[in-house]
Amino acid sequence: MGIRLLIGSLVLAQALTAGYPLIEIESPPDYHRLNDFTRTTISNALPDLKNLVLSDTIHIRYKIVSSQAGFRSAVGAGLPHWANAVTLFPQKLVVIQTPDLSRTTLRDYRTTVIHELVHLLQGQSVPLNLTPVWLNEGLAEFYAGEFDYSERVVLSRALFRRRLIPLNNLERVLTFSHPRAELAYAESAAAVEFLIDVYGTETIRAILRGMRDGSDFGKALEQTTGSEYADFQDHWRTYLAHKYNWIFLLDIQNILWLIIPGLAFLAFVSIRRRNKRTIRQWNDEETQAGMDEENN
């Protein structure tokens, strides 16, 4: 399998979006349909990612691997065990595991393809090592549709428990445990959501353009939003508190914990009332029986 993977099958497909170059996808010979699915996913996602592209010359290259040996050979060591895809620079290459290798659904695989595509496009506009990790991962989460109900609950629970991770500390996300990484990704996506909700859809492009023109991230952020980096983070935390503070209560587990005691109390009251009625009925019956005996 390792030899077959190295030989692979190289498929070149013209991107459907005007102005984009060829989409180059390498995959094992037995994964032609997954290759086509990957290409279609990329082509369909490109129009929604135009704000990340500042150059007319971009490269889109994916390498699909079906074995852990092939994955390690392509990406090297140092990734957490939960990582099933990575975008490599300066190679401008996405290495991604097949769904059967990563034990994920085709839907999850599609999400990962788009997540890494965001990294690939953003990194060709502004090197990813110049932008904060929360922006890199937040953009990928946001555009791949990963900032869903479950991530919002994770974020809300952390807010309630006062366990938010400062944005600056997210630089070490690859060293985090899976639960802590899950929170880090949710925070990153929420920060990008905040940027877009408050400052508009062109904000991301304006920040990237400012950095491409020579500003560092903090300066580009200030030029675009009018807020210094520290103030931006304060505003973001206020935004989170207003929008997500109590969402965790809608989590089904929390709902059950709230409902079950109430149901138990209602059951107790109902049983107690029923017992009182039964006792009263027995007393009435005994009283009536006593009156009947006296009359006889």
What does each model-identified segment do?
Residues 13-17, 124, 266-270:
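Short hydrophobic alpha-helical membrane-anchoring segments
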Residues 1-20:
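Hydrophobic secretory-pathway targeting helix
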Residues 64-70, 98-108, 160, 182, ...:
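Noncatalytic linker/hinge segments flanking ATPase motor cores
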Residues 244-296:
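C-terminal single-pass membrane-anchor helix
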Residues 2, 155-156, 236, 273-276:
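Generic hydrophobic, helix-prone segments enriched in Leu/Val/Ile
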Residues 19-132, 217:
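Juxtacatalytic substrate-recognition/specificity segment
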Residues 86-93, 107-111, 125-198, 202-250:
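Acidic/His/Gly-enriched intrinsically disordered linker/tail segments
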Residues 23-25, 59-63, 95-102, 131, ...:
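Low-complexity, flexible helical/coil segments
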